[in-house]
Amino acid sequence: DMEWAIDRSGRVRWLQARPITQLPGDLNELDTSPDPSHVYTWCNIGEMMPGAVTPLTFSITGRGIDIGMQQSYRRAGVPVPQTEGLRYVGMYFGHLFLNLSTLSEISAHVAGSSKQQMCVAICGRDIEEIPEPARTSRLRRALSGSRYFYQLVSAARHRRDLDALVADLRVPSTGAPEAIYQAIDQNLHQVWKAYELHLLSSSSSGALSPILLGILAKGEDPSQEHHAEVAQMLAGAEGVESADIAEGAERIIDRLVEHPDASVRFSAADPTEAFEWLCSAESGPAGEELARYLERHGHRAVRELELRQQGWADDPSPLIVSLQSGLRARIRHGARPKPADRATDASEHPILRRLLPIAHAAIRCREHTKSGLVRVTTEFKRAYRGLGKAMADGGLLPDEDAVFFLTHEELGQRIGGRLELEEIAESRRRALDFQMPLHFPQLFRDRPEPLRLEAVEGEDGALLGKPVSRGTVTGRARVVETLEQAAALEAGEILIAPITDVGWTPYFNLIAGLATDVGSAVSHGAVVAREYGLPAVVNLRVATTRFQTGDLVTLDGNRGTLKLA
């Protein structure tokens, strides 16, 4: 590491030099081997798992997604070969990507499916770089099409099967490292099954969105207005599991407002002390409401399929901070008006009138099974954390957090005596900080290169994104890069964030609108924004760098734009 300066004459002067001791590990150490002819994307998977993942998460979540997709394709009649490798998921620089080329093979074997529908479901548009696969015989496609249709209408059964799996799953988290690892290993098939059932129950939701767009666009490329109209149609879904995360937080705040000591004992307290008070008998109905909330939603969190990330039941501090912000806003500004029913009248579209109830049911099913999948993941999070503690206590790892920086297979090898893995885990932990903020092209072949995102602008200089919840609002911007920064949100501000997953939901009762760099019509933020009647635009790419907190901005959820007011 050499430090230098240039003097007035232009001569270079060396100031000091020292050995570099904290270089990260290889950022591409665990990269998968790409097929140079295949097209990859971060769409969909980058919304579900934004940023880089730990090696353990790659070996469980990444593989779980891939196995779930393989099984759902086989059920639909696609002849997917048995393989130990990944077919539909890739990882580069620690980030997960989907292989659109292999995913498009469903259109070759299943009647009623097409490459275009698959691309619209994942990326919101057709991808011309992917050729339409050569199709098999009509008879074979018809038979597979009937199997695929049966799969779409069997979502309720898949939901029940996942509920039963969740109810029966128990993975030990204490004992000797060998015993914990063996218990985890013997139960991994439950993770693969959970992903399969979630993807099967979600398939109808993914299939219906491009169908609705196609009907509105009458076979042409869908416009911003078509995307906005579909978003308004989807807003009619009721009883969505993830929407209750925000509504449940509101119920806790309702009880806190009624408590005479809440402003001192909760709102102004340290988050740890506030949680302890809320769990005590002194908090009364507010504490009872929190207990019910954690029973239903305690497994949820930001980046909740990352095994290193604890749920709210195990680390309640992010939830408590959001409740404190909500209580302070309620005291200053009063309760937020309930959103009006914004569901569209589809009576002019006979086909849409029949499809909308099915689409709403599909959204409810997808969000319910996503919650079940996270419950399964949480059981393994706790087991792996227990394994990390046992390995650290036994001198096999430097600390329990290091467990997340070895793959599942490598953990077994470390228990078996492979010494160098301890140092490898430390190196990967340093690499994660370098991998996390990287951005990549939406589409690429071969290996991607990190890039600086470029804006897409409309005629008036406004940032152009995808409208996912209708309405227009003007207000002060709150630019938030991390969930921790969201604690500064004030009532009525427009939240501008890289992406919002379930961990951000408790703040939705504060904001007046939502703008994100990344997202789609079925991403979590879009679903909850529609339920709350919030204007929302996603896929703005550079909103978090273009705007600053305090800017007066106009968010147009009809046109899909964000600009200075």
Label every PLM stretch briefly.
Residues 7-25, 477-484, 488, 492-493, ...:
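Acidic, glycine-rich flexible loop/linker segments
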Residues 15-68, 72, 81-85, 513-515, ...:
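Extended active-site and interfacial segments that coordinate phosphate-rich ligands
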Residues 1, 9, 24, 38, ...:
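Contiguous hydrophobic, helix-prone segments at protein termini
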Residues 21-24, 41, 46, 50, ...:
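Generic, ordered loop/turn and secondary-structure boundary motif
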Residues 452-492:
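Phosphate-handling DNA/RNA-contact segment within nucleic-acid enzymes
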Residues 41, 45, 393, 402, ...:
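Glycine-rich, flexible loop/turn motifs
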